[in-house]
Amino acid sequence: MSKRSKALRAADAKIDREKLYAPLEAVRLAKETSTSKFDGTVEVAFRLGVDPRKADQMVRGTVNLPHGTGKTARVLVFATGDRAEAARAAGADIVGSDELIDEVSKGRLDFDAVVATPDLMGKVGRLGRVLGPRGLMPNPKTGTVTPDVVKAVNEIKGGKIEFRVDKHSNLHFIIGKTSFDDTQLVENYGAALDEILRLKPSAAKGRYIKKAAISTTIGPGIPIDSNRTRNLLTEEDPAAV
């Protein structure tokens, strides 16, 4: 057995699989059981009680994490003229129009987020097969199809994340780094949880959040009590809070 496997087994042994941890306790345990030797990411995953095959049960949105993700996103902006210049001034990493669209269609993917002005969406729409499966396709609902490219770039650079339920009814995204303090991670988790609850489809029946877990880049998943939606910065029993 490799040293890495032994470390992961030892980390997993610290987790009570019969328990649902309070968010603060889960964050602490996730950091404690991380076996990476670098500043790994902290991720959260939710299993939702929705059927993503039905349009009225799709869960998709954005949230501005109060403490960011710990990673500065590389932002690509499809724009021309003054808006292209404004995007560059705002800190966009890649800016262009027709030529850039052609590069992306041929496989260029050195970016983490995409913004487009409305006038270019007729052309950008052809990139659906490339950007769609990667969750990068610009969309008015998430603020990434907009004439205000400066606002969009600033929000993404400032820690705005986008999430979308996958075909297995899962949501997963980064909420920070293992170097973040516990409070920062819990507050980021809380901001994301609030938005996910706000977006609950009216057509969804039964329990909305079925499961939730926090994990690090190299570490086990820590099951979270997803019913815990307030007083997140305590480890007390919710019934006693």
Swiss-Prot record:
Task: Name any Gene Ontology BP term.
Answer: translation
Task: Note the superkingdom of the native organism.
Answer: Bacteria
What are the protein's UniProt keywords? Repressor, Ribonucleoprotein, Ribosomal protein, RNA-binding, rRNA-binding, Translation regulation, tRNA-binding
The GO molecular function terms of this record are: rRNA binding; structural constituent of ribosome; tRNA binding
Q: Please indicate if the UniProt record lists RNA-binding as a keyword.
A: yes
Q: Name one GO cellular component term.
A: large ribosomal subunit
According to the UniProt entry, the coiled-coil residues are none
One Pfam family, short name please? Ribosomal_L1
How it assembles, according to the record, is: Part of the 50S ribosomal subunit.
| Entry function | Binds directly to 23S rRNA. The L1 stalk is quite mobile in the ribosome, and is involved in E site tRNA release. Protein L1 is also a translational repressor protein, it controls the translation of the L11 operon by binding to its mRNA.
Q: Which HAMAP family match?
A: Ribosomal_uL1_B (MF_01318_B)
Report the protein name in the record.
Answer: Large ribosomal subunit protein uL1
Q: Which species is this record about?
A: Streptomyces avermitilis (strain ATCC 31267 / DSM 46492 / JCM 5070 / NBRC 14893 / NCIMB 12804 / NRRL 8165 / MA-4680)
Lineage runs: Bacteria, Bacillati, Actinomycetota, Actinomycetes, Kitasatosporales
